[in-house]
From Swiss-Prot:
<feature type="disulfide bond">
    <location>
        <begin position="44"/>
        <end position="72"/>
    </location>
</feature>
<protein>
    <recommendedName>
        <fullName>Class I hydrophobin 2</fullName>
    </recommendedName>
</protein>
<keyword id="KW-1015">Disulfide bond</keyword>
<dbReference type="GO" id="GO:0005576">
    <property type="term" value="C:extracellular region"/>
</dbReference>
<comment type="similarity">
    <text>Belongs to the fungal hydrophobin family.</text>
</comment>
<keyword id="KW-0749">Sporulation</keyword>
<feature type="signal peptide">
    <location>
        <begin position="1"/>
        <end position="16"/>
    </location>
</feature>
<dbReference type="GO" id="GO:0005199">
    <property type="term" value="F:structural constituent of cell wall"/>
</dbReference>
<keyword id="KW-0134">Cell wall</keyword>
<feature type="disulfide bond">
    <location>
        <begin position="43"/>
        <end position="91"/>
    </location>
</feature>
<comment type="function">
    <text>Aerial growth, conidiation, and dispersal of filamentous fungi in the environment rely upon a capability of their secreting small amphipathic proteins called hydrophobins (HPBs) with low sequence identity. Class I can self-assemble into an outermost layer of rodlet bundles on aerial cell surfaces, conferring cellular hydrophobicity that supports fungal growth, development and dispersal; whereas Class II form highly ordered films at water-air interfaces through intermolecular interactions but contribute nothing to the rodlet structure.</text>
</comment>
<feature type="disulfide bond">
    <location>
        <begin position="98"/>
        <end position="116"/>
    </location>
</feature>
<keyword id="KW-0732">Signal</keyword>
<dbReference type="InterPro" id="IPR001338">
    <property type="entry name" value="Hydrophobin"/>
</dbReference>
<dbReference type="GO" id="GO:0009277">
    <property type="term" value="C:fungal-type cell wall"/>
</dbReference>
<dbReference type="Pfam" id="PF01185">
    <property type="entry name" value="Hydrophobin"/>
</dbReference>
<feature type="disulfide bond">
    <location>
        <begin position="35"/>
        <end position="97"/>
    </location>
</feature>
Length: 123
């Protein structure tokens, strides 16, 4: 049940995406603003080719744009120097909006596969 809730929540993020600036000119703060409530910007070293919807039975097709990301670290948008930097300067890997997890270490690397929405799908 939890997995379906997460997928529905993240699918709403994809559906709400608008046409904004290109990913190469996006600041960290703009990226954070594109994430839904309860989500934050993460920089992830790995992403699976299999969409997250397939891991829980396709999610009735609502999981378009979702993927499983791993080896993620949270990008701190509360630091003004970081928030105003370009996203591609702060994250050379895969930038994504991921649901904040209570098990996430504040400054650590999250090794679990998280259902996330690539920021490039949101702008």
């Amino acid at each position: 049940m939890y997995a379906y809730t997460v997928i529905a929540f993240l699918a709403a993020s994809v559906a709400a995406a608008g046409n904004g600036p290109s990913i190469s000119s996006l600041t960290v703060q703009q990226a954070a603003n594109s994430c839904a409530n309860g989500q934050s910007v993460y920089c992830c070293n790995k992403t699976s080719n299999k969409p997250a919807g397939n891991s829980v039975g396709d999610g009735a097709g609502i999981a378009n744009g979702l993927s499983l990301f791993s080896q993620c670290s949270k990008v701190d948008v509360n630091v003004i120097a970081i928030a105003n930097n370009l996203l591609n300067k702060e994250c050379q890997a895969n930038a994504a909006c991921c649901q904040d997890s209570p098990g996430t270490a504040a400054a650590g690397l999250v090794n679990a596969a998280l259902p996330c929405v690539a920021i490039s799908n949101l702008v």
